[in-house]
Each structure stands twice: as structure tokens, then as C-alpha cells.
From Swiss-Prot:
Protein name as it appears in the record: CinA-like protein
NCBIfam families: cinA_nterm (TIGR00200), PncC_domain (TIGR00199), PRK00549.1 (NF001813)
Entry's family note: Belongs to the CinA family.
Domain of life: Bacteria
SUPFAM superfamilies: CinA-like (SSF142433), Molybdenum cofactor biosynthesis proteins (SSF53218)
Amino acid sequence: MSDPRYCAEIISVGTELLLGNILNSNAQFLAEELAQLGIPHYFQTVVGDNRDRLQSAVKIAAERSGLLIFTGGLGPTPDDLTTETLAACFETPLAERPEVITDIEAKFARRGRVLTDNNRKQALLPVGAELLPNPSGTAPGMIWSPRSGLTLMTFPGVPAEMRRMWTETAVPWLHQNDWCRSILVSRLLRFWGISESALAEKVAPFFDLQNPTVAPYANNGEVKLRITAAAASEAEGVALIAPIEQELRAIAGRDCYGADNDSLASVVGALLHDRGQTLAVAESCTGGGLGQLITTIPGSSQWFWGGAIAYDNRVKQSLLNVSAETLAEAGAVSAVVAEQMAIGIQQRLGTTWGVSITGIAGPDGGTETKPVGLVYIGIAGPTGCFSVERRWGAERGRDWVRRLSAGEALDQLRRSLLNLT
């Protein structure tokens, strides 16, 4: 572990956070920022609006971290206790800052309001603290070193205000005061078609690396590997990451579909665009989810022509030319129907590729032979048509089945496009 004097700790203040009424997006933002600045960060604490418990949290944090970053509790109401509690912790008196009063009065005047007594509370800071201005609101923060080797930073809980104060004032201060001794450079590799456990088994030796480090993540069917290097410069970090990325890509093969801000839809779009090819989709159980993923990509109109949400069998027949006999014999959720849907939309819109999805998203509608979570994906292309079966299960619910099905359809198309190269 790094020297505690150069470690940061985030303390989020607010009973609403403890109750789960709001997400702690401030802590997430600050954690990512600290990582990018290369400042070690090992602990986070959430404390309600209670003076004694906040004092206890501060005393614990001050023994293990040299930079304590507080969000919340800077407002004008009685339960906003952060500033006065910190002053009490270090036995320092509060003093009113005239420049804060002037700033609040000006902001109130622009809104046609008059400064009230409770807002004067926001101008109280411990003697010796440096003002951390709030350009957007009335609650300023502070940067304060109550003792050698300890720095406190306070921010309001409003995310937009906190982020602006952090970026405009706190980050420059950290650079000027030698907190950013190295930077962290990261590369995120993205995988589809392999489970987290299977990928982890393949790349297990990489998890023992120290610089760069490799860590796995998984959500919504996608697996990610984050490669992170500590370095003196971005160029040095990139150089450390490059050979590790090359090895990981070689091991994973085509299960690795992209990196950083890539998505399955953006990768598929780039492949189609480069080949001058086009796509249409026919969806049943995803109800437009596949088309939505595609149309989030800027410029997708160059290669995506449109689609059909063929929920009812009559629509499958009239729009996609799925035969009534096939529907009667195999059922709407079947490989042959998925293939006929893909061919039907390909032919109707005249595109290079047609992709279809039909399945049972649940929670009802499943049978012993066709359970909830059963999905068929059809891919029609220049060299023919095929389908794949996936059984996602019912445990994670309807949205999970729909999200995975849309992602899998894009991945099957991606793999088909790569096979043409």
C-alpha cells in the first residue's frame, strides 16, 4: 500500500445516500478522477447527517489517508453539518468570509431574492482555510490543512456544482501541490461471446502483474479487461500497456470486439461502412431494442436502412413473408422462423444483410420445450442464411433477455462480417 500521506479518501455526507434515495454519483466521479491523476485511493465512507458519526468517520480517515475529500452537508439548513463538524474535530473556530457573503448576495440579486440569515451560515469557514469557490451555487467549499500531512477538501453535494469546482479549482491545486506524482493510463478491452470465468481462466497469469495491472469486469453480457499503468507521462503509460494488450487480444481472438468507447453497434457499423454494405433488422421479442442500439451510432443512416417490429404472426407473414405453414409447424420461436424473418427483411428493404430476433422474453409464455429465455437469431447475408439458438434463462428477468439478445445479434453479425475478409 502507498504511503498514507499521499492517499486520498472520499467521505460522502448525507442521510439520503444511506437510505438509497439517490445514487452516490459524486463518489464514482471522484474515484475515476483520482485514478486518472494517479492519487492512490483505498477507502470510501458514507455518513448520514449526524455530527457525532461524522466526527468519528473523520478521525478514522485522518489516520489512514492524507487527503480527505468531502461531498455534501454544505447547505444552509440545520442538517448541513460538514463545515462546523470539521472545525470542531480540529478545535478551530469558524469565521465569516466577507467575499462569500458578497458572492451569495450577488447571486440572490440576479434571481430577485434577498439574502436570508440561514444562508450566512454558508460563509463560515475554519480560520486558515482556503476558499474553494462555487461558480454555480451558493455553497462554497474549502481546502484546509488543519495539521501537517493532512488536507481536507469540501464540496457541495449537487453533482454539477461539485464537478465544476473539482475541475476548475481542486485539480489545479493538486497539481501545484505535488499530489499528482504519476498518472494512471488505462485501456479497456471489450469482449462478447465468452463468460467472465472462461476469459479469466484464459488470462489468469496477467492478473498477477503489478504495472500494468489487469482486472476483469462484466455487465449486461459483456466482459471487459481494464489494463492500467502508472507512469510519469501518458506516452510512457501507453508504451507499458501496448504489449499486454497485444497478448490479451491474441489469446482472446475474435471474442475481443473492441476497446475503450467502442460498442458492438459501432464496430458493426464501421465494418459495414468500410465494405459499402447495408443492414436491415426484423425484431420480435426485443421490440426495437436492436434498432435502438444501432441508431445511437452517429452516421448509422449510411449503412442502416431500417427494420420491422414483427410482434404478431400476421406481421411476420405480411411484412417478412414468413410462411403460415412454418409458423404452425415450428412455432414463432424457432430457428426456421428466425431465418425466414432475416431473409424477409433483407429482401423487402434490399439490403446486404438482414438480422432477426425471435424469442420468449418472459416472464410468461414459456413451456417445457421452449422455456423463457429461449431466443433464435437469424443472419441473412451475401453467402446465405443461418441461425443461432441461445438460452438466457428466466432468472434475471425480461429486460436481461432482451438486452442480451440484441447484443448477441450484433455480435453474430460482427463475426459474419469478419469471416468475409
